[in-house]
Amino acid sequence: MPRFMTIWLPRWPVQRRLLDRPELRRVPTFVCRRERRGTMTVVSWAWPRPPRPAAAAPARIVPGMSLAEALAVLATAHGSRACRLAEIDHDDPAADLAGLEQLARWCRRFAPAAGVEQAVAGLEPECIHVDVSGTACFFGGEAALVRTAAWTLAARGLHARSAIADTCAAAWAAAHHTDLAPPGSAADVQAPRQCRRWAVVAPGAQRLEAGRDAALSGLPVAALRLDAATVDMLREVGIDTIGGVLRLSAKSLASR
């Protein structure tokens, strides 16, 4: 049976810069894009320190937020001095893609076939897919392989989450939600759920069968790589998880 490993590098644009310029790890770093009207919007970011204990939980920075809003959040969490120290760099999608392709070639140590994911819904690639069919045995099993991938990249200074499943799509979903996806074998002990960096979806477990839910049923619908409008539409009709989508019939979907 084919098996695929997805390695997700969250906030890849800023991770690439931190890898090339380690000195940036000491200061808040923003990668921004200039829009048509001259507004700077955040593409990726990194904070080297946790918020101050006295600070209330700050608003979450999301891609597309204006730089001014992001700096306001930074000031709330770390004080105004952090804004003065912040490093602001311009978006460079071509360099980001080249860096990810170079990392994909490095990932061929796990299996000969490895490549960068295709961009979907206007989002730049942040994942590497590796065809690990028949190669996991050389690493002591799939749980050991997926763990080795995350740890080896961490040793290089990269934060990565990895998952193995029957298809690239299922592995992508599990890698983006390792806190919700199956952890693998019982012996594969990790940190608490919110800290998990890898997951293994057992062969065939992603399929919905009579009397048994699919292993990824509890993941949010965003794990299907749908555009934001479709995700919002599904939530409006009460469908928040992949399991909710799988259990829908064509007739009930039309009525909703």
Briefly describe each language-model feature range.
Residues 75-76, 180-256:
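Compact, charge-rich alpha-helical regulatory domains located at protein termini
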Residues 22-24, 140, 145, 179-180, ...:
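Hydrophobic alpha-helical segments
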Residues 144-200:
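Structured, non-catalytic alpha/beta "coupling" segments that mediate domain-domain communication
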Residues 15-17, 139-140, 173, 234, ...:
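Short helix/loop capping segments that flank catalytic or ligand/cofactor-binding pockets
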Residues 1-129, 134-136, 143-151, 155, ...:
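Residues that scaffold, gate, or flank divalent-cation-dependent active/transport sites
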Residues 38, 169-172, 252-254:
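Flexible loop/turn segments at secondary-structure boundaries
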Residues 100, 175-176, 256:
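Charge-rich, low-complexity amphipathic helices
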